[in-house]
Amino acid sequence: MIRFLFFLLISLNFINASSNKRYGAGLDIGSKGSGIFFNYLSGNVEKNFDLVGEIRYFDIIGDTESIVYDYWTNQYVTISGQNLLFIPMLVGFNYHPFVGKIANNFSPFITFRGGLNFSIDGKEGNGSYKETWRKADTQWSTAGFIGGGIEFRWYNQSSIALHIGSDIIKLKKKADQKTNYSGLLIHISFNRFIID
């Protein structure tokens, strides 16, 4: 934990010193669940390396979870659901190997991120919101993401990035009978450049 905080402080110092800064938000769609995220990117002047800080809110779906229509109540209902949330906090980098070699602001990249995950395991069942989350089990574990993607930069100081890769989340103790929640993740990011 102390090493991660030290790395984060060094990373923030690098972020503030660079000139190619942007922030964004987006959607995560994965084999284990879905969610939203917020990120902050700081790149070098050559635009081939970005340091990334990111926080996510990820709702984990159960292996047998499905949504059915209840004709009696005229509502959609989740059956066999689980109440498990992940909040990963990651720091990493994007490397753009083809900067200046491809026209039209199209930039493929590879990415690596690592950090901590805070998991909240709520009580299962059909209780109220308060009953579900009142005495939820929590734990910290390591998390990471390895993948590739494409960033489209536009002249109006914004960009869209599509990442596809492997989310690596292994818990220290079981949450809903599992410790390994790694899997495929599609990460869609909408970014805005910060003009100094």
Question: Which residues make up each language-model segment?
Answer:
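Short glycine/proline- and aromatic-enriched beta-strand/turn motifs that initiate or cap beta-hairpins
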Residues: 16-59, 65, 189-196
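Short loop/turn motifs that connect adjacent beta-strands in outer-membrane beta-barrel proteins
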Residues: 17-21, 45-49, 98-107, 154-160, ...
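Sequence/structural signature of outer-membrane beta-barrel proteins
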Residues: 22, 32-34, 60-64, 100, ...
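Extracellular loop and loop/strand-boundary signature of outer-membrane beta-barrel proteins
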Residues: 23-26, 74-81, 130-136, 171-178
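Membrane-embedded beta-strand positions of outer-membrane beta-barrel proteins
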Residues: 23-27, 38, 51-55, 91, ...
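Short sequence motifs at beta-strands and strand-loop junctions characteristic
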Residues: 28-32, 81-86, 102, 136-143, ...
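Gram-negative (and chloroplast) outer-membrane scaffold detector with strong preference
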Residues: 43-129
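Outer-membrane beta-barrel "beta-signal"
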Residues: 90, 180-196
